[in-house]
UniProtKB/Swiss-Prot annotation:
Originating species: Chlorella vulgaris
Family from the record: Belongs to the PsbI family.
Protein location: Plastid, Chloroplast thylakoid membrane
NCBIfam families per UniProt: PRK02655.1
Protein name (record): Photosystem II reaction center protein I
Lineage: Eukaryota, Viridiplantae, Chlorophyta, core chlorophytes, Trebouxiophyceae
Cellular component annotations (GO), alphabetically ordered: chloroplast thylakoid membrane; photosystem II reaction center
Oligomeric form and interacting partners: PSII is composed of 1 copy each of membrane proteins PsbA, PsbB, PsbC, PsbD, PsbE, PsbF, PsbH, PsbI, PsbJ, PsbK, PsbL, PsbM, PsbT, PsbX, PsbY, PsbZ, Psb30/Ycf12, at least 3 peripheral proteins of the oxygen-evolving complex and a large number of cofactors. It forms dimeric complexes.
Length: 38
C-alpha cells in the first residue's frame, strides 16, 4: 500500500510539474495543436 501511495504521489507531482512547465513556457508557435487539448 505504501508503494501505491508513493507511485500516486510521483504521478501527481509529474503531471503538476508538467502543467506548470507548460503554463510558464506557453508558446503557441511551438504548440500549434494546443487548442485541441483544451
Amino acid at each position: 500500500m505504501l508503494t501505491l501511495k508513493i507511485f500516486v504521489y510521483t504521478v501527481v507531482t509529474f503531471f503538476v510539474s508538467l502543467f506548470i512547465f507548460g503554463f510558464l513556457s506557453n508558446d503557441p508557435g511551438r504548440n500549434p495543436g494546443q487548442r485541441e487539448l483544451d
